[in-house]
């Protein structure tokens, strides 16, 4: 989603 960059 829009916050996939938060998936570590």
Curated annotation (Swiss-Prot):
Ordered alphabetically, the record's keywords are:
Amidation, Neuropeptide, Secreted
**Which GO cellular component terms are attached?**
extracellular region
- Modified positions (Phenylalanine amide) are 8
Keyword Secreted recorded: yes
GO biological process annotations for this chain's record?
Answer: neuropeptide signaling pathway
Q: Where in the cell is it found?
A: Secreted
Q: Which family does it belong to?
A: Belongs to the FARP (FMRFamide related peptide) family.
Can you say what this protein is called?
Answer: CalliFMRFamide-8
**Source organism per UniProt:** Calliphora vomitoria
């Amino acid at each position: 989603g829009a916050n996939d960059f938060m998936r570590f």
